[in-house]
Amino acid sequence: MSKIRLDQYLCQNGLVQSRERAKALIMSGIVFVNEQKVDKAGEMIAPDAKVEVRGHDIGYVSRGGLKLEKAMQVFPMRPDGKVCMDIGASTGGFTDCMLQNGAVKVYAVDVGYGQLAWSLRTDARVINMERTNIRNVKPEDLAEPVAFFSVDVSFISLKHIFPVADAICTPDAVGVCLVKPQFEAGREKVGKKGVVRDPATHREVLKTAEGYAMANHFTPAGLDFSPIKGPEGNIEYLMYVQHCDTPQPLPEDLIEKVVAASHDTLDKAPNLH
């Protein structure tokens, strides 16, 4: 097998979104090949080498920022000058990415407690709404409506998120939602360790999520796969939505194409630690 540049490997396997990002990670000393640290982007490695990105020196407080980074690269969405909401904030990777890209305020909502990074807790632009179930959030709980939002939640379906987003968002709001097959598919379709591998189930879940969006005045205007897999190796999807009066479905056959591309790219890709 012919060898490949390390920075190129990281891009091709969905660990980063650009060669520039790959080079930065490699030079920072957190990329390991077969358990050995490699700090040269041009290092030639075997395609079947064990490659790991260790630590959190990825430009954001958590890898969630990489998901929103990709969404902003492939969809026409920007948080510049907008009031935003990070639904399922956890450590705050999405919040961090929003702030780095010009958000004027971010409501960081999470049912958990004590997870948000200290740098974000102490940022005047961040409204820390921890211990808050998004299903209970009402327009009167916010100082103003939300124009840009992200959703990255676990153990809850998007079915319960879109009605809230419909109520709290501006008429022209945009958002990106992580569609996670492991939390949307029926229990009988979820495999060992909560992993859903069947492309047919992925297509079914995305079609259902599309319906949830449209039923709550959101047009699913774009679809791609997350650049990194979930903790147990689940492939997850980025659905770009636009708030509107007359929702339209995704272009025909887009779901099938994106699911196929996601498996081609990520089935054998290492996880980002």
How should each PLM-predicted stretch be described?
Residues 159-176:
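A short glycine-rich, Lys/Arg-flanked "PGG" loop and its adjoining helix->strand segment in the class I
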